[in-house]
């Protein structure tokens, strides 16, 4: 089950001493200790109920689901990711220790699915937020496909080189955001003749100084442009 091909791991001396490299030993030790963080937002996540059952029993791969990102090294994303959920997903990914991996499960996670059609609130692909190692298409994917994706990820882990992994982690730092808490104040609004309608301009186009406008107490009659 856990046997992987290591180029330097099979060489033995006449005294039955295994000679290998630190890189291969590190990869071998992580093969059976992938602890996933299950991030499900839609119907694809229901397939995990079958995967955890006795028929498929994904515990045999050493997968122990964790509820804390600081104890996980694999995150399984399943379901639609909305704009409101995007910062939470990025924060969970950043809280995971290195090395860490991502499996995108389902069409909604990979491309946004049918919910991304003419939708302003759906992220069209989780890879726009965090780097993805394995894509698992389907609506929803079967438990056998999930096991196959985990097997492919384990093969990738077994062939990793420490220098390449470190360089890849530095390149992916572009996904890091500075989490700083700001004092939330009244949001801006536009006063139309027909009534008060909230402005739909994306927050990325509004400077942070203009986005939060200080008012000690604001009533509905005091909202101006």
Swiss-Prot record:
Membrane disposition: Peripheral membrane protein
Cofactor note: Binds 1 [4Fe-4S] cluster.
Keywords: 4Fe-4S, Chloroplast, Iron, Iron-sulfur, Membrane, Metal-binding, NAD, NADP, Plastid, Plastoquinone, Quinone, Thylakoid, Translocase, Transport
Subcellular compartments: Plastid, Chloroplast thylakoid membrane
Entry EC number(s): 7.1.1.-
Reactions mediated catalytically: a plastoquinone + NADH + (n+1) H(+)(in) = a plastoquinol + NAD(+) + n H(+)(out); a plastoquinone + NADPH + (n+1) H(+)(in) = a plastoquinol + NADP(+) + n H(+)(out)
Metal-binding keyword on record: yes
Primary location group: plastid
One Gene Ontology CC term in the entry: chloroplast thylakoid membrane
Keyword Transmembrane helix: no
Top-level taxonomic group: Eukaryota
SUPFAM superfamilies the record matches: HydA/Nqo6-like
Xref: Gene3D superfamilies: 3.40.50.12280
Family: Belongs to the complex I 20 kDa subunit family.
Subunit annotation: NDH is composed of at least 16 different subunits, 5 of which are encoded in the nucleus.
UniProt function note: NDH shuttles electrons from NAD(P)H:plastoquinone, via FMN and iron-sulfur (Fe-S) centers, to quinones in the photosynthetic chain and possibly in a chloroplast respiratory chain. The immediate electron acceptor for the enzyme in this species is believed to be plastoquinone. Couples the redox reaction to proton translocation, and thus conserves the redox energy in a proton gradient.
Protein name in the entry: NAD(P)H-quinone oxidoreductase subunit K, chloroplastic
């Amino acid at each position: 089950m856990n046997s992987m091909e290591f180029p330097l791991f099979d060489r033995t001396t006449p005294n039955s001493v295994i000679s290998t490299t630190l890189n291969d030993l590190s990869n071998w030790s992580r093969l059976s200790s992938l602890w996933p963080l299950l991030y499900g937002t839609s119907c694809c996540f229901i397939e995990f109920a079958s995967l955890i059952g006795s028929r498929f029993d994904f515990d045999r791969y050493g997968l122990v689901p964790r509820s804390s990102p600081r104890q996980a090294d694999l995150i399984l994303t399943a379901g639609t990711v909305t704009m409101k959920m995007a910062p939470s997903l990025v924060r969970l990914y950043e809280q995971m220790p290195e090395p860490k991996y991502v499996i995108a499960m389902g069409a909604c996670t990979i491309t946004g699915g049918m919910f991304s059609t003419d939708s302003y609130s759906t992220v069209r692909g989780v890879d726009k937020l965090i780097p993805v190692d394995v894509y698992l298409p389907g609506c929803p994917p079967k438990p056998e496909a999930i096991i196959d994706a985990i097997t492919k990820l384990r093969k990738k882990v077994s062939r990793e080189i420490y220098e390449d992994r470190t360089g890849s982690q530095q390149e992916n730092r572009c996904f890091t955001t500075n989490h700083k808490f700001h004092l939330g104040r009244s949001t801006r609004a536009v006063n139309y003749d027909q009534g008060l309608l909230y402005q739909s301009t994306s927050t990325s186009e509004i400077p942070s100084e203009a986005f939060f406008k200080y008012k000690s107490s604001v009533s509905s009659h005091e909202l101006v442009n």
